[in-house]
Regions:
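Ligand-binding pocket scaffold of soluble enzyme catalytic domains
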Residues: 1-217
């Protein structure tokens, strides 16, 4: 299996990029509300007639909805952040025809999280009815908020039950959270690199990530 296909091969396989609204206002677990909740997402493959072949893939903390293929740009507001690293799908080696997540059999959905910066409502988005960006005033979001917002997307696609939820790192924890919150809507779970306990070194790395985000905004 080629884990480093060239751009011409990636262009032959690309997802469908779309935006979806979550409930307005979308109420967060802490009681705060988002009046303009938008999710940027990509889909791969075809949803079957029974609408029961869908797989929801959660990306890692700094990932995007672009899980596979090649996408040169997203939108005018996102493109300044859409570096060369973003253009190539982060799981190309696993997603596609006859690959681990076989898009000839399954319909794959991957959405950028609320709080992300690749098209979904996040710190770099404008506040509702304003030219001002949220930046550090963006509400705190929990893993439950991220899962519930994505299940709103699943509802909008009229999918009652997911064939599987899949994710690695933060994405793996969100896959676990989905199974806990919506067990009746999830048949299978694949959670990678998301153990219940972590070593002190990982705590340090997480702290570094938090500080990098705080210093950036």
């Amino acid at each position: 299996m080629d884990f480093n296909p060239d751009v011409s091969e990636l262009n032959a396989f690309r997802g469908t990029f779309q935006f979806a609204s979550v409930d307005e206002p979308f109420e967060l677990l802490n009681g705060q509300k988002l009046d303009d909740g938008i999710l940027a997402y990509e889909t791969y493959g075809e949803l079957n007639e029974n609408r029961d072949n869908a797989i929801l893939v959660f990306h890692a903390l700094s990932g995007s909805q672009h899980a596979a293929g090649y996408r040169e740009s997203v939108s005018r507001s996102v493109d300044p952040l859409w570096t060369d690293e973003c253009k190539k799908g982060w799981w190309d080696g696993f997603i596609g025809k006859n690959k681990v997540i076989d898009t000839s059999r399954h319909f794959l959905i991957c959405a950028n999280y609320v709080g992300g910066c690749y098209g979904s409502t996040g710190p770099t988005s404008n506040k509702a009815n304003s030219e001002d960006k949220y930046m550090s005033s963006f509400p705190w979001v929990s893993m439950e908020d991220l899962v519930r917002s994505q299940m709103k997307l699943i509802d909008s696609l009229q999918i009652k039950e997911l064939h599987a939820v899949v994710g690695a790192s933060l994405g793996g924890l969100l896959a676990l959270t989905t199974m806990l919150l919506f067990p009746q809507r999830t048949r299978s779970l694949v959670s990678i690199a998301s153990g219940l306990k972590i070593q002190p070194l990982q705590v340090i790395h997480n702290f570094e990530q938090v500080k990098a985000i705080e210093n950036d905004i």
